């Protein structure tokens, strides 16, 4: 399955919520009619079946993190193999992706931009250049911007934007050195309450 390259706001309208696919400079409701689904006439959403609700939740989370269908399925299988709550395990696996950590540290204004930075070898983990967006970051890993990439305008702009957002408790960033530490894997209480991971577990349990 190819990665979606179309309008980002169309995906947010499809899911009926902000997927944080844009930089966040403007509120999403000033950019599009979030309460209507995409299409020529922007029909309002009908009542979904239980399966439909579960599917939409899975698609929402998958799109927030920019993960393809096969990748997402593999993450779920790994989460189910681990001890503890499968839904929480799933979110923690997604949160430890390198592209997501780069976004959380404020080096990129969106996860898609973070994925580009990683792919273009602008990110260093523990002193080694890593260009795999799905690379798993572990507690106490150092994630920094490569020296020759530190003057990129988009990174500087992203850091300025990150100053306006609430900073995640599980990362620590030196914005002058462009060097951060992934202090710990976030707990469920740290993450968005707008995600209902139990619906995803129910979907895959069918």
Curated annotation (Swiss-Prot):
Keywords in UniProt for this one?
Answer: Ribonucleoprotein, Ribosomal protein, RNA-binding, rRNA-binding
Domain S4 RNA-binding, by residue range, is 96-156
Pfam families (UniProt xref) = Ribosomal_S4, S4
Q: Which PROSITE patterns does this one have?
A: RIBOSOMAL_S4, S4
- Which cellular component appears as one GO term in the record? small ribosomal subunit
Q: Name one GO biological process term.
A: ribosomal small subunit biogenesis
Reply yes or no: does the keyword RNA-binding apply.
Answer: yes
Function of this protein? One of the primary rRNA binding proteins, it binds directly to 16S rRNA where it nucleates assembly of the body of the 30S subunit.
Q: Quaternary state and partners of this protein?
A: Part of the 30S ribosomal subunit. Contacts protein S5. The interaction surface between S4 and S5 is involved in control of translational fidelity.
> What is the protein name for this chain?
Small ribosomal subunit protein uS4
Q: Which organism is it from?
A: Colwellia psychrerythraea (strain 34H / ATCC BAA-681)
Q: What taxonomic ancestry is recorded?
A: Bacteria, Pseudomonadati, Pseudomonadota, Gammaproteobacteria, Alteromonadales
Could you tell me the gene encoding this protein? rpsD
């Amino acid at each position: 399955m190819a990665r979606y390259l179309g309008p980002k706001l169309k995906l947010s309208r499809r899911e009926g919520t902000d997927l944080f696919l844009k930089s966040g400079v403007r509120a999403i409701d000033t950019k599009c009619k979030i309460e209507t689904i995409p299409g020529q006439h922007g029909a309002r959403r009908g009542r979904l079946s239980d399966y439909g609700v579960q599917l939409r939740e899975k698609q929402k989370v998958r799109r927030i993190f920019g993960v393809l269908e096969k990748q997402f399925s593999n993450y779920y299988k790994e989460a189910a193999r681990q001890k503890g709550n499968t839904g929480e395990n799933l979110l923690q696996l997604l949160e430890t992706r390198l592209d997501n950590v780069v976004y959380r540290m404020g080096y990129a204004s969106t996860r898609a931009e973070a994925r580009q930075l990683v792919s273009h070898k602008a990110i260093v983990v523990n002193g080694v250049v890593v260009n795999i967006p799905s690379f798993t970051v572990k507690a106490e890993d150092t994630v920094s911007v490569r020296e020759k990439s530190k003057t990129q305008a988009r990174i500087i702009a992203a850091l300025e934007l990150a100053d306006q957002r609430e900073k995640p408790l599980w990362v620590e960033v030196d914005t002058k050195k462009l060097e951060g530490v992934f202090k710990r894997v976030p707990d469920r209480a740290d993450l968005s309450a707008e995600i209902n991971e139990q619906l995803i577990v129910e979907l895959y349990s069918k």
